[in-house]
C-alpha cells in the first residue's frame, strides 16, 4: 500500500498508483509478520491458506471451490505440514506458522513471491526446515520470480541467483549472488571484517581473524 515520494514503482509491468490493486494482488504472493499478526489464533490452517484465493484472511463467506481446497492441501503437504488442515493457528509452532504463511503466499500461483524475513524468530531446527522448503521452491523450474529479505546469509536457500546488499538504506552492491555476497562487500556493509563462505550450497559469514 506504500507509494514512493519520488519516482515510480513498477511491478509486473504495472505502475503503482495507475493499476487496480485488487487486480494486481493475486499476481503477488507475500509472506510477512504483518500478515501473520492479523490471523486469529482460532483460525484453521486450511482456511488461512485457501482464503488467499479471495485475498482475505480466514474463513470466506462463500463455499470454497473443490479445486482451491485441493490446492491448499497440496501446498501444505509440500511445506511438510501433512494432516494440519484442521489445526488452529494458535497451536502451531513458530516454524509451522512460517510454512503456512508461505503456502498461503503460493495459493494463487503468483508471478512474484515476496518473503520478508521468513526465518525471523526461528530456532535452528525451524530455520533448517524452512530453508529446505525454500530450496525446493527456488530450484523448481516452474517457481515464480522470488524476492527474499534476510539479515543472515545462513538463511539463503539454494536456487538464489542474484543478491542486493543494503546498508543504512542505500544499495551498496547488486548482481549475481556469487560476485555480490563477497567478504569485501559484506565487511563494508556490516562495518566489520567478515569472511564469507559458500559450501555445499549454503552461505555463511563469520568474523575474520
Model regions and ranges:
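Conserved catalytic motifs of ABC-family nucleotide-binding domains
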Residues: 109
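ABC ATPase nucleotide-binding domains
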Residues: 187-209
Amino acid at each position: 500500500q506504500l507509494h514512493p515520494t519520488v519516482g515510480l514503482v513498477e511491478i509486473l509491468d504495472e505502475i503503482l498508483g495507475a493499476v487496480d490493486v485488487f487486480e494486481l494482488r493475486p499476481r503477488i504472493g507475500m509472506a510477512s509478520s504483518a500478515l501473520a499478526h492479523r490471523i486469529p489464533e482460532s483460525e484453521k490452517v486450511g482456511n488461512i491458506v485457501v482464503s488467499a484465493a479471495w485475498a482475505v484472511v480466514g474463513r470466506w463467506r462463500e463455499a470454497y471451490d473443490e479445486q482451491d481446497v485441493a490446492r491448499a492441501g497440496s501446498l501444505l503437504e509440500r511445506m511438510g505440514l501433512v494432516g494440519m488442515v484442521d489445526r488452529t493457528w494458535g497451536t502451531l509452532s513458530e516454524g509451522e506458522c512460517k510454512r503456512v504463511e508461505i503456502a498461503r503466499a503460493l495459493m494463487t500461483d503468483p508471478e512474484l513471491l515476496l518473503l520478508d524475513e521468513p526465518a525471523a524468530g526461528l530456532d535452528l531446527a525451524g530455520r533448517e526446515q524452512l530453508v529446505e522448503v525454500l530450496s525446493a521452491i527456488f530450484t523448481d523450474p516452474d517457481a515464480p520470480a522470488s524476492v527474499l529479505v534476510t539479515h543472515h546469509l545462513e538463511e539463503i536457500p539454494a536456487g538464489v541467483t542474484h543478491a542486493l546488499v543494503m546498508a543504512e538504506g542505500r544499495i551498496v552492491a547488486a548482481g549475481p549472488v556469487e560476485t555480490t555476497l563477497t567478504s569485501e562487500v559484506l565487511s563494508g556493509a556490516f562495518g566489520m571484517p567478515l569472511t564469507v563462505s559458500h559450501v555445499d550450497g549454503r552461505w555463511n559469514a563469520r568474523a575474520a581473524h
